């Protein structure tokens, strides 16, 4: 009876699998180029929660391969816009795992198509994240990132950061195992010098982990061997991109004070002084190294006797620059205020110091890195939500040009443009015509059709503005030097009409800025939000009165009790 029952079960299961395969074959034929039958499409996302063993998967995969021609499968690329399935129905077959290296390369291939913050991530990313939920899987993902990300792809380091940032935090055992596998030291840094991608990727991984694990875990990760490895990568014999990411990794390790002291004691500042001279190098890789070296010498690894850059830079001809008081927290701005770089995992943004309300205006940007940046125009109402991935062009008060993904951004929606992908050294022009209510974008002098949609929300109060993905950098020209591709129509420049006092031009290093904040004395009756004006306003109906009128007018609910604000009453007697 048991044997008979088992035979009936096997027969029914075979029939069910046959029907399922037939159904999948018809679905695959129906979906066609939408990628239902591709390896990347629906075969690599997650594991079934049932207790079925892997042998069933193998049999099912063989049956599927015989039912669907291999050539057909390979010829149909996955539609990157189609949202992946996240859930699994009761009869849905288990998604099969792909080779880790293939998943990493698939993610790199489709990363340019991720243009919506609410868009589901690609199948490959979801699978990698699932794999990384175990120590063994996390180690496989990290080693694959080091092994297969190519040197020439401008988004390679950003993909490393993106994948590791979204993966679960590694355990202490996983970190220990990783250091044992890598076995880094000065000698390892000298090996495979003809293949710098491995060293670049290793440094990028270390930097991402240092940023993500700031604190005791970061201290434990910076072993003597890893410190020796990163310092060796800074030597002039190394490839510039290896030097760049080794320096960025050291910067991120230095976010923990104990690591900062350890790195400073290694005489790193002596090496950085040499690299600082590359800040204006015509080679754009060396220029990035020089920028980061100068920033580190000014902000992190101070050298005794060295004058800080802001104290000696000549700003006499500069009347408009990037605003160090109107910027998200992790963006690096050069001492002359015309160059910016992001090395954080967030989407950092900045506006310039000059606002325009009428007329025709133009500025240019030199592309130093060819990755994702959104550059254009924004009003004061445009919000910088760096940790949520929103920047210029992601609300109704800004419009941006994206030369990497070849898109125009407005109100968090994008549309393609006909310019080729930008590359290092390209010049992007930005024309704002407030008379005709239009914006025109140029790439090396070639213009696109005008953009007008932003003027449905605002017609004045525009600033030059930009947002940067990880490891991106560019230089702005607001008219302090001749433009490379001036437009044919008559226009004005910021530098001709703006004015900044000598004090307003100073971009202080972070340690100097913190020192000034410590000297600020706060009055007892000051506003609890701005700490500047007197707290002279009472909120009704809750009755709290710790705010000034300017701050109170910007709030809809009380910051103390969260009750809705119905009215605001100025208390004249509180003014002193």
From Swiss-Prot:
Species in which this protein is naturally found: Macaca fascicularis
UniProt keyword Signal present: yes
Lineage per the UniProt record: Eukaryota, Metazoa, Chordata, Craniata, Vertebrata
Gene designation per UniProt: RSPRY1
Residue ranges covered by zinc fingers (RING-type): 527-562
Pfam short name (any one): SPRY
Polar residues bias spans: 57-68
Entry keyword set: Glycoprotein, Metal-binding, Phosphoprotein, Secreted, Signal, Zinc, Zinc-finger
Composition skew (Basic residues), residue ranges: 83-97
Keyword Phosphoprotein among UniProt keywords: yes
Name assigned to this protein: RING finger and SPRY domain-containing protein 1
């Amino acid at each position: 009876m048991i044997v008979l029952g088992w035979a009936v079960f096997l027969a029914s299961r075979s029939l069910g699998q046959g029907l399922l395969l037939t159904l999948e074959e018809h679905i695959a034929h129906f979906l066609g180029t939408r990628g239902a039958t591709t390896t990347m499409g629906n075969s690599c996302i997650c594991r079934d929660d049932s207790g079925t063993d892997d042998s069933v998967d193998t049999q099912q995969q063989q049956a599927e391969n015989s039912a669907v021609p291999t050539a057909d499968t390979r010829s149909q690329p996955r539609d990157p816009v189609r949202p992946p399935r996240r859930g699994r129905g009761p009869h849905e077959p288990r998604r099969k795992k792909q080779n880790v290296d293939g998943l990493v390369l698939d993610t790199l291939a489709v990363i340019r198509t991720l243009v919506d913050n609410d868009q589901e991530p690609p199948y490959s990313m979801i699978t990698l994240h699932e794999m990384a939920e175990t120590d063994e899987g996390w180690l496989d993902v990290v080693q694959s990132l080091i092994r297969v990300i190519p040197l020439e792809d401008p988004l390679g380091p950003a993909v490393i950061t993106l994948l590791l940032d979204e993966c679960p935090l590694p355990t202490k055992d996983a970190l220990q195992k990783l250091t044992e596998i890598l076995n880094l030291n000065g000698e390892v840094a000298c090996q495979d010098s003809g293949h710098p991608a491995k060293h670049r990727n290793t440094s990028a991984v270390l930097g991402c982990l240092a940023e993500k694990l700031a604190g005791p875990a970061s201290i434990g990760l910076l072993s003597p061997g890893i410190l020796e490895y990163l310092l060796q990568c800074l030597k002039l014999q190394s490839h510039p991109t290896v030097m760049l990411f080794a320096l960025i990794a050291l910067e991120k390790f230095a976010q923990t004070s104990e690591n900062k002291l350890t790195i400073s004691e290694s005489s790193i500042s002596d090496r950085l002084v040499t690299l600082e001279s590359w800040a204006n190098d015509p080679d754009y890789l060396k220029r990035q190294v020089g920028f980061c070296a100068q920033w580190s010498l000014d902000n992190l690894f101070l050298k005794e006797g060295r004058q800080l850059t802001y104290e000696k830079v000549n700003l006499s001809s500069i009347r408009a620059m990037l605003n160090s008081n109107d910027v998200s927290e992790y963006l690096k701005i050069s001492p002359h205020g015309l160059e910016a770089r992001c090395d954080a995992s967030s989407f950092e943004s900045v506006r310039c110091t000059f606002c325009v309300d009428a007329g025709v205006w133009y500025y240019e940007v030199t592309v130093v890195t060819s990755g994702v940046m959104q550059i254009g125009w924004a009003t004061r109402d445009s919000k910088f939500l760096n940790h949520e991935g929103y920047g210029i062009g992601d609300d109704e008060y800004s419009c941006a040009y994206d030369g990497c993904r070849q898109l125009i951004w407005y109100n968090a929606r994008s549309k393609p443009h006909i310019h080729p992908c930008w590359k290092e050294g390209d010049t992007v022009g930005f024309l704002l015509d407030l008379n005709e209510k239009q914006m025109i974008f140029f790439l090396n002098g070639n213009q696109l059709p005008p953009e007008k949609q932003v003027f449905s929300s605002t017609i004045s109060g525009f600033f030059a503005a930009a947002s940067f993905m990880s490891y991106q950098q560019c230089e702005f020209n607001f008219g302090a030097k001749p433009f490379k591709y001036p437009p044919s129509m008559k226009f004005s420049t910021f530098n001709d009409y703006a004015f900044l006092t000598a004090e307003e031009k100073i971009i202080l290093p972070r340690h100097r800025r913190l020192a000034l904040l410590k000297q600020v004395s706060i009055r007892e009756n000051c506003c609890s939000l701005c700490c500047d004006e007197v707290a002279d306003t009472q909120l009704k109906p809750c009755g709290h009165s710790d705010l000034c009128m300017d701050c109170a007018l910007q709030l809809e609910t009380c910051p103390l009790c969260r009750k809705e604000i119905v009215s605001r009453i100025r208390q004249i007697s509180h003014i002193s």
